[in-house]
UniProtKB/Swiss-Prot annotation, chain A:
Signal peptide limits: none
GO terms for cellular component: nuclear origin of replication recognition complex
Quaternary structure note: Component of the origin recognition complex (ORC) composed of at least ORC1, ORC2, ORC3, ORC4, ORC5 and ORC6. ORC is regulated in a cell-cycle and development dependent manner. It is sequentially assembled at the exit from anaphase of mitosis and disassembled as cells enter S phase.
Compartments reported by the entry: Nucleus
Keyword NADP among record annotations: no
Residue spans of biased composition, Low complexity class: 1-19, 39-49
Tissue: Expressed at low levels in the shoot apical meristem (SAM), leaves, ears and roots.
Pro residues: compositionally biased ranges: 20-31
Name of this chain's protein: Origin of replication complex subunit 1
Residue segments, region Disordered: 1-56
Keywords of the record: ATP-binding, DNA replication, Nucleotide-binding, Nucleus
Pfam families: AAA_16, ORC5_C, ORC5_lid
Protein's organism: Oryza sativa subsp. japonica
Amino acid sequence: MSQPVTPRRTTRSSASASPSPAPASPTSPPKSRPKPSPRRQLLAAAAAPPKEDGSSADALLAELPGRRAQAMDILRLLAPAPALPLMLHGGAATGKTRALLLALRYLRPSQRLVYAALRSLPSPRALFASLLSQLSATPFSTSSRHRVPDKPSDFVAALRDALNGIVSQGEVVYLVFDNLEVVRSWDKGGQLLPLLLRLHDLLQLPQVVLVYVSSATPDAYYSMTGSVEPNYVYFPDYTVDEVRDILMHDHPNPKLYSSFLSVALKPLFRVTRRVDELSAVLEPLFRRYCEPLGDLKAVPDEGMKRRLFEHVQSHLAVALNETFNVPMRASMDEIKDGGSAGKGSAKRQFAGKDGLSSELEFHMSVSAKYLLLSAFLASRNPATLDAALFDSTGGLDNRKRKRKSSQASMHMKDTIVEEMLMKGPGTFPLERLLAIFQCITSVSEDILDEIDCPGNMASESGTTGLMSDVLLQLSTLCNSNFLSKSRSCPLEGSARYRSNIDEDLALKVARSVNFPLSKYMYRR
Amino acid sequence: MAAAAAAAAASVASQAQAVLRGRLCDQAVVHSALRSSPDTNYSKLKYLVASSVSEACNNSVLLLGPRGCGKAAVVDMVLDDLKKDHPDAISVIRLNGMLHSDDNCATKEIARQLCLEHQLSFSKMASSDDNTEFMIDMLRECGLAHKTIIFVLEEFDLFAQGKQRLLYSLLDAMQSLTSQAVVIGVSCRLDADQLLEKRVRSRFSHRKLLFVPSSVDSLQRLMEHLLALPEDSPLPTNFRVVSYMDIDSGLLSMQSFMNALSSMQRQPKMDGLQDLSILELYILVCMNRLEDKEKSSYNFITIMKEYKSVQDAYKTSDKYSHTVCFRAFEHLLDRELISFADNKGRNQALEYRPVKLLISSRELAESLKLNTTCPAVLQKLLDRERYM
């Protein structure tokens, strides 16, 4: 318990936050250190003394396109030292943290920055440790004699002591709490949150400026007894023009790129307004756009523009219906580093609908695929229909009995459909899964035999050998999250399973083993 | 010449701004105007505490009122005055309900502060019982030495959670004749005294001082007091206005007040609605339609069904695939414009968990009206169902 928790990230940022140019901590091996993210570089930059030339307000505003009003607000509210608490709020990817850190860099002389990203500090204890270690003059290592306080009272006392030492030297301290919204879901978040928000009252130190950054709106923090509200600065999402400015920023061929953006940005903007997602989608699209061009430095004329537009139009339609997955920063860098690899991945991304099935090659054994399909069927079909669907004759054409569709029965059917939609995939016991598995493998036994290993030991030795194998594969599927295992039912005592895959994926898997899945699916 | 004069004016202005900012950030200065006028809570509290110090008796009082009415500032001012009047006769112990609501922690803190006041060495290892005993002994000793201990309990309502052992032992110790102590509770819950247990309540003197938000007149006086500069310099609220002060002219113009007002009167939900993409708006409108159809609960799959039917009916260009819509749905969840209806079924896939809107249809309609890029179809979809 007495072992202080100091996450690696905090020790590093504390090393960079100390005003003297501290040497890189020798304890952390340089090889295992991940690539610094832009945010962390910014953090280091915010802590470092400003460069002589680039610290004018205009330079600051130039670095924050579309955020002029917000940056001015921040500067005004923070600027001469005594300041009331400040809260920046706005959606994801609107430049809250960036604007704040750049503004703090601009205000740099005679201030000290303590930055806590609450998302990376999983508990109050880690938060306290991080704050105190950033404040203490000597970065405290895990083996130091300092005891990390875990009670709020001890923490506030320790924090006040540490801050008093700095403030008495005439320095201003900026305490920044980033990602404040995650505290709400913490274990004791309900107690910690008022503490953080009322820190200004508790500390009573005018030279300590508190800044909160949150993607949740201020009304998420109202509590029963209230607290004195901080000053809010709202960061709205970027407009189309601002997004264009941001994307055009420092582009090698602005003419070409702007003609591309005039085609591609508007439709994508209807789907999402987040800059990070947009830039992730636009990058491969632009590469596609440039393909007909031999020379990337070329300035396009009208005819060329039209040709390029016709070329990119089909790809644009595909891109619109693809998920915007924002790649990790590191992997994005890799794509940029290796040009050929980047092109390969871009090609794969735009292989189109028909290409998807070829892309979808999981290395999965045939019986695992069958198991997956039977789990899918067991989840989607009502259990009462199993007998009809998997008759010993293997056919399902004997469903001739059709009830009269009276008004009442139609209505009942509607509500059942509704219920199915609400409940989602159902759960099933292991026995049902195995029964379905046996049925569908026996139906397509000929296919299985073809593919089976030449020894054909398993099928000869009967079902017992197959079963043990199946159980193993079942646990593999559960581990890879294709199936989920729910808690065991208190009455029956056995665990129940549920399939997590959607219909598209199931159909693709079925196609890969030539299994007529749609024949077995209960249509409502 | 003119430039030099302008620079001088700017420096004077920034000095003035610094003075004003410092003043507005300091609680004590903000409420010190109360000191001068009679018949305020300040004078009442001062009379109460001063009389119990001079007459050597026990007393307890609650200061109740919403936040920002100057409760803590009044306590501070009274204590400052008393320290000046009776420098040796009082010692102050401060506790905060947010930090010390735990009984053990509170008694430890009391013992620590008592030790600090009386130059005794404080043992961190002392048990909670030891600390309580020490507190009672100190109360007796101080009573014999005619010294008053003043306990200031901020966030008093939080001390009234749980067993209230601290309050009981404190108020019980004050029942004896030898002790000499004042308990000042500060809370922004007006029903704080109702939270007390019977055994605690019976030992509590039911003195309450109610703080109300200042009237317009007194606010005006307060503003004058705050914004007038000490020397009669050529320069003529709140913090935000001063921050928006125009450094070039050195004046607090009407414009800066207007700016500050507009940035403080924001409606976060409406702002959030303005930030949505068209697809996200479609999903919200579909959810609103489902709610108007009096669906008891619905999830992403049902929303997609509605979305498909809308797209089929109107043949708009905004028909996107399932996964793209799901990403937009996740954005809405992120922005907290919609949320899951219950906490059950955490292991269920997100598509199937029931959701609900966190905005009213009026807000949605207004934001659609304000949104210039919003397609007319959306507006129609929302309006039609209202008049049907």
